[in-house]
Amino acid sequence: MPLVTLKELMKDAEAKRYAVGAYNVINLEMIRGIIAGAEEARSPVILSFAEVHIPLVPLEVIAPIILAAARQAQVPVAVHLDHGQDHEILIRAMQLGFSSVMFDGAHLPLEENIRQTNEISKIAKALGVSVEAELGKILRPEGGGAEEEIEEYDPDDVYTNPQEAQTFIEHTDVDALAVAYGTAHGVYLTEPVLDFERLKLIKELTGLPLVMHGGSGLDEAAYITSIQCGIRKLNYYSNMAHEVANTLQAKLAANSAKQHKSYYHDISRWAMEAVQQDIVRTMRIFGSAGQA
């Protein structure tokens, strides 16, 4: 099936009020497991690769693998660069064939975020590539363990300001906007408190498909309410990666207890199966199952 853009996926998700899962990948097992899950669920899907994961696998190495898998899939697939901040890397991803990129300028002042977003958007639009931007600070759990982030904060200082979001979309040409309303990257240590009223107002003022980052580990009700309030792309990685690791540990321990040998090809198969199972579960919650 031909590669699709984020804009195309968001158009259908907006019309039918569901969210498309964007799943970060770092190897072939994750790529194949996600595609298998999407095909089982008959769901559109976004294969996402984060700039921060380039030290694990070079962009030029993994891009052809992701793109080949996407084109061979029996469901619509967009290939997306996640949390791109380096303009050179963003441009390389587009040149390699990614159908969507995220420019993450959330750490910048509003005016500079707008300026740099427009720089990337101009190049992307010329190449037929969709663009996601970010406004507001999406935290890590308990400040994420990052030294520069503190545990106590005023939501108005870090969450997306609805009026700024309106200004941002009036001065940019993006296809989706990632917003901060209480989610955090990583696995949650305590139950997050999500500001759904803020999310609804952002949707009302911008009209854009909105993106949830830090989508791992929320309860089902939080996902559903977020989608009802305007979330159309839902990033999901940490919980999936954690589930795979737990599965591998359990399988290896079981084989060891039976004095059975384990081989790397066993681990590869177990990983793909664990990813597929988790992906199907999330797609049913996100409402994308059956939409392809």
Question: Which sequence ranges carry the predicted segments?
Answer:
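Short catalytic-loop micro-motif centered on adjacent basic/acidic residues
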Residues: 20-24, 79-80, 102, 210-213, ...
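N-terminal amphipathic alpha-helix/helix-capping segment at the start of soluble metabolic enzymes
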Residues: 1-21
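Catalytic-site beta-strand/loop segments enriched in glycine and acidic/polar residues
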Residues: 15, 23, 179, 204-208, ...
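Glycine-rich beta-strand-to-loop/alpha-helix junction loops that act as flexible
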Residues: 182, 213-216
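An acidic- and aromatic-residue-enriched active-site/binding cleft used to recognize and process polar
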Residues: 136, 215, 239
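C-terminal alpha-helical cap/extension of soluble enzyme domains
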Residues: 219-292
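Alpha/beta enzyme core
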Residues: 6-12, 28-53, 59-76, 84-205, ...
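A short N-terminal beta->alpha junction/helix N-cap motif
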Residues: 18-26, 50-54, 266, 270
